[in-house]
């Protein structure tokens, strides 16, 4: 059951993330926009023993492998399950890391997409369990391989006509001025909203160089090291124009994540923020200081500090959720900081 929460006097409950997203979507609608999104949901499948203990990745396959992909039938079962629940699936495939998979949900209104996403995470875990496996949306369960992200494709449509307002066939990137302001807003608030898009201590072990995850706050077309990517659109299909935000991970609350993205983009439109030049080279092999690039937060602690300083994002989620989210995440960060890991024991105990 998915619903919005109201107080006894009939007012939307301020602590309900679904109400927060609805409020932000109402603001967009008042400006003439409809916010559309499509998440790419990545996850790992692990083997389990008879007691349910998690063991190792289900297979040794990689991106779009066939012969070593042991979960083709499971992904098909997952897709059929979602579709039977009214959740449209765009694509399914094996991802880069062993045991890693991706299911892309079809473009939808942001509220419907968030509802589908929270449902899908539960459903996919259930299907995995029926096959004797454990599905995890932990961003980085295995060191040394790619982590699981949740890239979010997004665009604004005209509220009344459904026309894609991001499209401009005459622009070199196919982007309208509105889309450029929207991207500029995402870049301006990237640090401030990062804690909502990547909410775990573990999230920041995914956002490191070398594993196809964004680190630098930049945008480009074919550049998969950039934070925002503009997919190339076939001539004549301009209604499909969209941008892809690459830092979110599947552990996020989609209602809060979509709220933050939309708030950032609308702020860019409202202030007509200029969009810096695109970067198309691999940013992991350039001097970021020479390019004037800043980075995403490198830890949950620094992400929380950035959120505290971002008035636009704080206003979007509201003081009730902001206070509780910051308190809960800060407690997790402090617990992690105080924990002495096995890595530290093995590295330092004998030599100091």
PLM regions: where:
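Glycine-rich, acidic/polar active-site loops that bind/position phosphate-bearing ligands
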Residues: 1-352
């Amino acid at each position: 059951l998915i619903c919005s929460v109201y107080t006894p006097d009939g007012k939307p409950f301020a602590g309900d993330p679904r109400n927060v997203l609805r409020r932000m979507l109402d603001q967009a609608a008042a400006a003439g926009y409809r916010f559309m999104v499509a998440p790419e949901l990545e996850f790992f499948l692990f083997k389990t023993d008879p007691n349910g203990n998690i063991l190792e990745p289900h297979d040794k396959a990689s991106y779009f492998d066939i012969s070593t992909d042991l979960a083709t039938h499971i992904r098909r079962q997952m897709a059929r399950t979602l579709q039977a629940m009214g959740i449209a699936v765009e694509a399914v495939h094996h991802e880069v890391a062993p045991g890693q998979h991706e299911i892309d949900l079809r473009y939808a209104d942001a509220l419907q997409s968030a509802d589908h996403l929270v449902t899908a995470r539960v459903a996919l875990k259930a299907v995995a369990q029926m096959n004797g496996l454990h599905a995890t949306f932990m961003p980085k369960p295995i060191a040394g391989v790619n982590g699981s992200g949740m890239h979010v494709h997004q665009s604004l449509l005209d509220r009344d006509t459904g026309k894609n307002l991001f499209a401009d066939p005459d622009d070199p990137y196919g982007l309208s001025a509105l889309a450029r302001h929207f991207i500029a807003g995402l870049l301006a608030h990237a640090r401030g909203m990062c804690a909502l898009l990547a909410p775990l201590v573990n999230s920041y072990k995914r956002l490191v160089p070398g594993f196809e995850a964004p680190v630098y706050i930049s945008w480009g077309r074919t550049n998969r090291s950039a934070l925002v990517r503009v997919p190339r659109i076939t001539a004549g299909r301009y209604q499909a124009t969209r941008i892809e935000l690459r830092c979110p991970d599947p552990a996020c609350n989609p209602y809060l994540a979509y709220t933050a993205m939309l708030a950032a983009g609308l702020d860019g439109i409202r202030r007509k923020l200029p969009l810096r030049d695109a970067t198309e080279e691999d940013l992991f092999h350039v001097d970021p200081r020479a390019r004037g690039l800043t980075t995403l937060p490198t830890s949950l602690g620094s992400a929380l500090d950035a959120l505290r300083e971002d008035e636009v994002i704080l206003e979007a989620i509201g003081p009730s959720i902001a206070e509780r989210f910051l308190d809960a995440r800060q407690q997790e960060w402090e617990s992690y900081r105080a924990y002495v890991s096995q890595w530290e024991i093995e590295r330092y105990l004998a030599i100091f």
